[in-house]
C-alpha cells in the first residue's frame, strides 16, 4: 500500500513499490494569490496529461527530468530527486513583478529571456534570491547554478516553440530542479510539473490569458482554458 509522503497545494507524493521511485498525484485544488483554495473539477487530470506530454518531449531533446511514466488519469511515476529550495522563473515578456516593481508596460518583449531565482516559501512570499546568496547558503554549487541556468533557457526555448505551434504564447514559466546521486557524482534534473499551473500562457492573437492567470480572474472559465491547451497539445 502506498504511503502519503507530502501533500502540496495541487499535488500529493506517495511512496511506490520500487526504491527511489515515487507516485505523484494531481488534484483539482488551486491556491489563489489571496490564499483562498478552490477546486476546479478536472484540472488535475488535464495537468497530468499536459505535464506527461511535455516531460516526454523534453526527454527526447536530452533534458533529464524525473518523469518515468503516466500511471492513470491523475497519477504518474517519478524518480526521487533531492529538491533545490528554489523556483527558477524564466520570463520573456514583462508581466507580474516587472510591471509592479519596475513600472514596465505589460506585454513588453525582452531582448532575451530573464531568469529569476525565488525561494520556495509561501510563508515568505517567494522572495527573489541572487546567485551569491544561493552559493553562500550552500544550496547549490557554482556548477549546479550554471547548469540550471543553461537548462532553464533551453527548456524555455523549446516550450516557446511548442506553444507557438498551437497558437499560444509562452510569457513566463516556473521551473524546479534538484539533484540525483549516481555513485559519487550528482546530476541536475528537472522536477515538478510543466502545465498551465506553472506557465503564464496568452493566446497568440488576442493576448487573452489562459490557464492559471484566467483561473485567478474567472474560475468558472478555467477548466475550458486548461482543456483547450491539452486538446491542442494532443494534436501535436
From Swiss-Prot:
ATP-binding found in the keyword field: yes
Key word Nucleotide-binding present: yes
GO-annotated biological processes: 'de novo' IMP biosynthetic process; cobalamin biosynthetic process
CDD domains: SAICAR_synt_PurC (cd01415)
Coiled coil stretches, renumbered: none
EC number: 6.3.2.6
Keywords: ATP-binding, Ligase, Nucleotide-binding, Purine biosynthesis
Top-level EC class: ligase
Gene3D superfamilies membership: ATP-grasp fold, B domain, Phosphorylase Kinase, domain 1
Reactions performed catalytically: 5-amino-1-(5-phospho-D-ribosyl)imidazole-4-carboxylate + L-aspartate + ATP = (2S)-2-[5-amino-1-(5-phospho-beta-D-ribosyl)imidazole-4-carboxamido]succinate + ADP + phosphate + 2 H(+)
This protein's pathway: Purine metabolism; IMP biosynthesis via de novo pathway; 5-amino-1-(5-phospho-D-ribosyl)imidazole-4-carboxamide from 5-amino-1-(5-phospho-D-ribosyl)imidazole-4-carboxylate: step 1/2
GO CC term (a single one): cytosol
Top-level taxon: Bacteria
GO MF term list: ATP binding; phosphoribosylaminoimidazolesuccinocarboxamide synthase activity
UniProt-listed InterPro entries: SAICAR_synt/ADE2_N (IPR028923), SAICAR_synt_PurC (IPR033934), SAICAR_synthetase (IPR050089)
PANTHER family from the UniProt entry: MULTIFUNCTIONAL PROTEIN ADE2, SI:DKEY-6E2.2
Family indicated by similarity: Belongs to the SAICAR synthetase family.
Name of protein: Phosphoribosylaminoimidazole-succinocarboxamide synthase
Organism: Rickettsia bellii (strain OSU 85-389)
UniProt gene name: purC
